[in-house]
């Protein structure tokens, strides 16, 4: 949380020249967390945001999640309308929509858990974030779980939990998240590599590949 910054682009503005991949990788912090905040600033950020309304809203949302444990997908998803459809394409579309409702909801819940942990260092939030995410990861073979957006959300959540909750995760838990990141990241890379040149207007390239893989 910082003040609003503003700047002007005029004739004197330097032309942006993107650095090489090697330069970017060399400047990555070697410690975690490093996405939402850097480890060296962690305690200072906690202190500065003790009374921040936005910070408090994440903690409040995270606390509410404890009251609503995540069930398995078969118990969470609403299929009452899906079973009435006879067209397989309509059924699949309906399942994707219903599945996304659950995954999108949990993405917001897990984001709140990760941020609450970073704002407090209370291990309960990190543990609950991983617990919910590991349940969602187990859904990938379910007939009720479909669509690239669900997979890309899992990729994003896995990255956030791995980085944000790194200190709390066990070796086995880190391995699960890294394998999930590698599996889904590889899938999207293979699907979209060199695709940008063919269809620059394909938003999935930006939403699923560049944004998340750059995390």
Could you say what each language-model-derived stretch is?
Residues 63:
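Active-site nucleophile-His-acid catalytic modules used for acyl/amide transfer and hydrolysis
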Residues 49, 58, 67-70, 75, ...:
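Aromatic-lined, polymer-binding surfaces characteristic
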Residues 24-26, 43, 53, 59, ...:
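Extended, solvent-exposed functional surface patches
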């Amino acid at each position: 949380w910082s003040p609003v910054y503003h700047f002007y682009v005029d004739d004197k503005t330097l032309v942006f020249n993107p650095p090489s991949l090697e330069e970017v990788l060399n400047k990555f912090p070697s410690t975690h967390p490093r996405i939402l905040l850097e480890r060296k600033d962690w305690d200072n950020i906690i202190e500065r945001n003790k009374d921040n309304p936005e910070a408090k809203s994440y903690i409040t949302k995270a606390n509410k999640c404890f009251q609503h444990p995540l069930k398995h997908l078969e118990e969470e998803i609403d299929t009452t309308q899906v079973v009435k459809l006879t067209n397989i394409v309509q059924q699949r579309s309906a399942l994707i929509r219903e599945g996304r409702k659950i995954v999108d909801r949990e993405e917001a819940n897990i984001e709140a858990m990760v941020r609450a942990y970073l704002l407090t260092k209370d291990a309960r939030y990190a543990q609950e974030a991983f617990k919910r995410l590991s349940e969602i990861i187990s859904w990938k073979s379910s007939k009720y779980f479909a669509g690239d957006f669900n997979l890309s959300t899992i990729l994003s959540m896995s990255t956030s939990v791995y980085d944000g909750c790194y200190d709390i995760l066990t070796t086995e838990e880190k391995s699960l998240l890294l394998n999930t990141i590698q599996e889904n990241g590889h899938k999207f890379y293979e699907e979209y590599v060199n695709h940008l040149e063919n269809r620059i207007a394909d938003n999935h390239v930006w939403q699923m590949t560049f944004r998340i893989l750059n995390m």
